[in-house]
From Swiss-Prot:
Play a role in cell adhesion by regulating the plasma membrane localization of the palmitoyltransferase ZDHHC5. May be involved in protein transport from Golgi to cell surface. This is Golgin subfamily A member 7B. It comes from Homo sapiens. It comes from the Eukaryota. Signal peptide: none annotated.
């Protein structure tokens, strides 16, 4: 477990050197936070379509849960007004709790699914909730397989940029 976390930290440090694929927000149902489940061709040889779609659908479900207005959200709002929002100094909102759950889920997916395949999933919060960023790394563990190095997908995702070292 400790070596997996160490490897994830190494991948994050070298994120600016990797090819990046961006999964855009899906506004087909309005402005609710959800991401497109369309499988990017750059990931074709790296991860199974089903695993990718399952991950994005799970994230979309978490974001729907975070934005759901229920009794607890209503009570939070009432308490916030009654205490001039001081209540939030000692209490997390429902939205913050779900965002933490999402961060844990992304960490788990990186450890179990993405990192072993040379991929790194970035929390959408780190990108302003605009995109899911997936960094693609060259195969360091496999012996001489250069088939993934000659993929034609590197030009279509180079519009990302150099802002990956913020953490």
């Amino acid at each position: 477990m400790a070596t997996e976390v160490h490897n994830l930290q190494e991948l994050r440090r070298s994120a600016s050197l990797a090819t990046k694929v961006f999964i855009q927000r899906d506004y087909s149902d309005g402005t609710i936070c959800q991401f497109q489940t369309k499988f990017p061709p750059e990931l074709d040889s790296r991860i199974e379509r089903q695993l990718f779609e399952e991950t994005v659908k799970t994230l979309n479900g978490f974001y729907a849960e975070a934005e759901k207005i229920g009794g607890s959200s209503y009570l939070e709002g009432c308490l916030a007004c009654a205490t001039a929002y001081f209540i939030f100094l000692c209490m997390e909102t429902h939205y913050e709790k779900v965002l933490k759950k999402i961060s844990r889920y992304i960490q788990e997916q990186n450890e179990k699914i993405f990192a072993p395949r040379g991929l790194l999933l970035t929390d959408p919060v780190e990108r302003g909730m605009r995109v899911i960023e997936i960094s693609i790394y060259e195969d360091r563990c496999s012996s001489g397989s250069s088939s993934s190095g000659s993929s034609s997908g590197s030009g279509s995702s180079s519009g990302g940029g150099g802002g990956a070292g913020a953490r």
